[in-house]
Amino acid sequence: MPQAVAGPEIERLIQLLARMPGLGPRSARRAALQLIKKRDTLLGPLAEAMRVASERIVTCRECGNVDTCDPCTICRDHGRDPSMLVVVEDVSDLWALERSGAVTARYHVLGGILSALDGIRPENLNLARLVERASVPEMREIILALSATVDGQTTAHYVTELLAHLPVKVTKLAHGVPVGGELDYLDEGTLSAAIRQRTAF
């Protein structure tokens, strides 16, 4: 077992950073050193921002997004199209779609996808609230923005069946060649989907 190179407080910081996705022990150690070197301009303000976030962040009861208010900023936005709902697996997907600037609808976060392997069943997801939201008179379209994985597509089929009794159109994101993507680098599944879902030029 490697020896500690610093006091317990610094080792604790490194251990916590190493729990972050994409950060292993070595990257966590480097990040900790940068924070320590810049403790006045980075570590202190970061610690304060994290303290405030920990105290104020809540989950929106309407859509499942995280924010410092409930309903969240997106649900409060009257400029959003109330007739469309974009269903996503996780908040990170919601944020990614928001960064694209392509969505003017509201969102619904499922909180995961169905997975027999991970033991995630329908009752573990935010599905009851989805049915409630899809049932309002002004709702016209539910857009399933779920992963193109087996579990993602299984979830999409389940949601489609769940909403089949409602007078709403259920659509899904197109799959295919990404903007700027070269065919040589794409996998067979992506190329196959791109051919099947081709559009007029």
Curated annotation (Swiss-Prot):
Family matches, as CDD domains: TOPRIM_recR (cd01025)
A molecular function (GO) term: zinc ion binding
Tagged with keyword Zinc-finger: yes
UniProt keyword list: DNA damage, DNA recombination, DNA repair, Metal-binding, Zinc, Zinc-finger
Zinc finger residue extent: C4-type: 60-75
Cross-referenced Pfam families: RecR_C, RecR_HhH, Toprim_4
Superkingdom per UniProt: Bacteria
Domain Toprim span(s) in chain numbering: 83-178
Family recorded in the similarity comment: Belongs to the RecR family.
Its biological purpose: May play a role in DNA repair. It seems to be involved in an RecBC-independent recombinational process of DNA repair. It may act with RecF and RecO.
Protein name (record): Recombination protein RecR
Gene: recR
